Curated annotation (Swiss-Prot):
Annotated source species: Mus musculus
Region (Disordered): 116-186
Name of the protein this chain belongs to: PRKR-interacting protein 1
Pfam family, one: DUF1168
Quaternary context: Component of the pre-catalytic and post-catalytic spliceosome complexes. Interacts with EIF2AK2.
Length: 186
């Protein structure tokens, strides 16, 4: 047996920090706990699961010898061989049907995806055009405002032009106006 002195020579084991028990209430908390555990020891390799291969049936045999019918007359073992071959063939056909259906659904999904993408692009183009139109309108209004400021800065030239044009405009307005008579009741 080991002496008590030999046991005391060994250094004491480092104590682990007590961890509080945390029960995640939702998926976000569970993910947070997993991330915290991973980040405690960043040197440790992270286990990344590989994608599981889909099950596929065994390829059919290239050559089947002495195929008997389903009757057991040829021998008691022949029926079991036939039954297993038939089961595998049915499995293979079901698998091929399922794969064809899956490919069909995938193709339909891709078509819908393309259709939605085109519709979204059309909508985006329409909105982009509208934004551009508004932007141009604002720029045009800004230019008009700047032109008006410039005209106000040069009042002598502008006032003469406005005076002559306003006289002509008032004369045409007077000629165009007809007396309006409103007769109320009898």
């Amino acid at each position: 047996m080991a002496s008590p002195a030999a046991a005391s020579v060994r250094p004491p084991r480092p104590k682990k920090e007590p961890q509080t028990l945390v029960i995640p209430k939702n998926a976000a908390e569970e993910q947070k706990l997993k991330l915290e555990r991973l980040m405690k020891n960043p040197d440790k390799a992270v286990p990344i699961p590989e994608k599981m291969n889909e099950w596929a049936p065994r390829a059919p045999p290239e050559f089947v010898r002495d195929v008997m019918g389903s009757s057991a007359g040829a021998g008691s073992g022949e029926f079991h061989v036939y039954r297993h071959l038939r089961r595998r063939e049915y499995q293979r056909q079901d698998y091929m049907d399922a794969m064809a259906e899956k490919q069909k659904l995938d193709a339909e999904f891709q078509k819908r995806l393309e259709k939605n993408k085109i519709a979204a692009e059309e909508q985006t183009a329409k909105r982009r055009k509208k934004r551009q139109k508004l932007k141009e309108k604002k720029l045009l209004a800004k230019k008009m405002k700047l032109e008006q400021k410039k005209q106000k800065e040069e009042p002598s030239q502008c006032q003469e032009q406005h005076a002559s044009s306003s006289d002509e405009a008032s004369e045409t307005e007077e000629e165009e106006e007809e007396p309006s008579v409103v007769i109320m009741g009898r």
